């Protein structure tokens, strides 16, 4: 696993993970002024993005750089504190937008069921409904090609040292 964090001024640093899996790469794209982290995941020619920011250029550049197809755009919940780029990203790539249970989007999207799984290359992203921050709040569990749990993307359900 290559896990890279990219801050709001474009600096990248590799973050250590205990297990090294060759079929998965994760980048965190962090915007400090909003305290918002988006995630770009690639595996075997496919990609997923979790909670994209409004400016979709950085995601499109990564997709082109890595020569991958964007398969899904995941949203952990409807965001009131920033404008998501999910609609523009979907329009640019034809990738479907995925929300968790109880979401009621006014646009075309997949409203996933609790426990539903989505394949991205050789990895799997599992939907875990976690209402609280919002009723449709969802965390996404990333599993490697062997079905081993690796990390969870919690959106605003969990904050560093706090709950959402």
Predicted regions: what they are:
Residues 56-57, 78-83, 104-107, 135-136, ...:
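Active-site environment of divalent metal-dependent phosphoester hydrolases
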Residues 15-16:
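Short, low-complexity intrinsically disordered segments enriched in A/P/G/S/L with frequent Arg
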Residues 56-98:
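Active-site metal-binding motif and surrounding structural segment of the metallo-beta-lactamase
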Residues 24-68, 140-155, 161:
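Conserved beta-strand hairpin/beta-sheet module of binuclear metal-dependent hydrolase folds
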Residues 50, 71-79, 98-101, 129-132, ...:
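Active-site neighborhood of phospho(di)ester-bond hydrolases with catalytic His/Asp-centered motifs
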Residues 98-101, 108-110, 116:
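Glycine/small-residue-rich loop that forms an oxyanion/phosphate-binding "nest" at active or ligand-binding sites
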């Amino acid at each position: 696993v290559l896990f890279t964090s990219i801050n709001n001024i474009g600096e990248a640093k590799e973050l250590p993970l205990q297990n090294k899996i060759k079929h998965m790469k994760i980048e965190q794209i962090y915007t400090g002024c909003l305290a918002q982290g988006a995630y770009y995941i690639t595996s075997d020619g496919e990609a997923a993005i979790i909670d994209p920011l409004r400016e979709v250029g950085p995601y499109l550049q990564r997709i082109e750089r890595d020569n991958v197809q964007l398969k899904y755009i995941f949203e952990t919940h409807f965001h009131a504190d920033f404008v998501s780029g999910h609609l523009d990203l979907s329009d640019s790539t034809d990738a479907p937008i995925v929300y968790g249970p109880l979401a009621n989007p006014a646009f075309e999207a997949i409203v996933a069921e609790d426990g539903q799984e989505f394949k991205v290359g050789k990895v799997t992203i599992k939907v875990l409904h976690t209402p609280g921050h919002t009723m449709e709040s969802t965390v996404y569990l990333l599993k490697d090609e062997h079905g081993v749990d690796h990390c969870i993307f919690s959106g605003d359900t969990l904050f560093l040292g706090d709950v959402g």
